[in-house]
Amino acid sequence: MEFHQPLFQRARERGLIPFTSVYDPRDLDFIETLGCPIYKIASFEMTFDDLLATTAQTGKPIILSTGMATLPEINHALEVLDKNNAATIILLHCCSSYPAPLGSINLNAMTAIGNRFNRLVGFSDHTLGSIAPLTAAAMGAVAIEKHYTNDPTPVSYTHLTLPTKA
């Protein structure tokens, strides 16, 4: 967790707002000392009730990724977050492939989950280029997460497939 401090500092020096994904409630105490203004919870954590409750109790906005979650899991996570007085929640639509072909992202699903759960929506973009995030914004996304790398040479599946520019 110590690697967060220099990253948060560097982001702030550049006028950015740093935040992080949390995977364990025990990590929140440390991350809170950094003044993290918002948290992201990965889709595979939708049934980790302790993490959901503890994150909600910070009173900070939460970005809830839905990429690998089922509708019942999303509903469950929202019930836990609401029960624990979560602040603003953004449901982040995601196609969990790298890179994601434009034809696979189904941005209608983004608006559908927003309507179904009466929540703000965003889009986690794994496509190449800017068409998908611009379209998502036009369709009502209030948050866009764009995956990219500044160096595609590391031996890693995601690094080899990510664009080098946002």
Annotate each PLM feature:
Residues I31, S65, L91, G140:
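Conserved, mostly hydrophobic/aromatic
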Residues T158-T164:
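Conserved small/polar residues in nucleotide/adenosyl-binding loops
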Residues I41-T58, L71-H76, A100-A109:
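Active-site-adjacent beta->alpha loops and helix N-cap segments on the catalytic face
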Residues L64-I74, V121-S130:
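Active-site glycine- and acidic-residue-rich loops that bind
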Residues M1-E13, T54-G59, T111-F117, L160:
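Alpha-helix-loop-beta-strand connector modules within alpha/beta enzyme cores
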Residues F30, I89-I131:
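Active-site/ligand-binding-proximal alpha/beta "capping" segment
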Residues F30, P72-A77, G129-M139:
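Catalytic cores of alpha/beta
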Residues M1-F44:
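Active-site beta->alpha loop and helix N-cap motifs at the rims of alpha/beta catalytic domains
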